[in-house]
Amino acid sequence: MGLLSKRALSIQQIQKHIEIFACPICKAQMAISEEGKMSCEANHSFDVAKQGSIYLLSRPMNSMYSKELFDSRHTVINSGIYDVMQEAIVAEIKAPAPILLDTGCGEGSHLHRICEKIGGAMGIGVDISKEGIIAAAKFYSEELWCVGDLANSPYNEASFDVILNILSPANYVEFKRLLKPGGQVIKIVPQENYLKELRVQAFADSEKESYTNAQTVERFKESFTTTKVKRITYTVPLQPELVPKLLEMTPMGWHIENKESIQLQEITIDLDLLIGMES
């Protein structure tokens, strides 16, 4: 028997986890046919795409992110510079064989690399960017990838053991609705020395050279009954060919006019790992 196509693999995975999915239009429970058509009782329907992704937006939405950005992000993340962060996340996950939702997953590399390190994990990535989800489905067939909006998410309540929110905007009300009892929200936010070598070269003596995410951390603490904060700080060597990719993938890089002048031998990753639970 030949290998299953990416689309067939996705259909199998959706069938196995269909109870997670709610219609983004009317919130009714979804079903899926053998042919890969997802539909609810009101007959709102959504097809699994050829590459295995699912488009679950109730209306079209624009994203500012390009295919080139996601290709750059894929290269940078898979170079290993975020491995320490990913391992720190894995160390905090308590549930056996967890179901994870990565909110704002982009091209999927963080979720895929985290799931690889956890026995029996099932990963679902959601992002408003169709380009990001197309890239994720192209790169990784082990996880499910959905174009969707967190403000109107296509999932039922109490569906996930872990919700990841990595360097991405959050919706804490929705996170708590989607979280299983005893589940964890794990959020990553930049700290003051994140990519400091880039900021020093590009934005010397300007407000962009330094910043703080103290308000984001405080809001997270206020949103959950139990929280924990861990600082992750390390510096890694940076290969020359990764520098333009790093500039392409980060919003900070978009504002640099003379990109060719940036020369980096190393880069600092400085993050807060926030863990929230409801008691």
Predicted regions and their residues:
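Conserved SAM/SAH-binding beta-strand->alpha-helix loop
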Residues: 127-131, 151
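A short acidic, Gly/Pro-enriched loop at the edge of an enzyme's catalytic core
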Residues: 151-162
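Conserved beta-strand signature within the Rossmann-like core of class I S-adenosyl-L-methionine
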Residues: 182-192
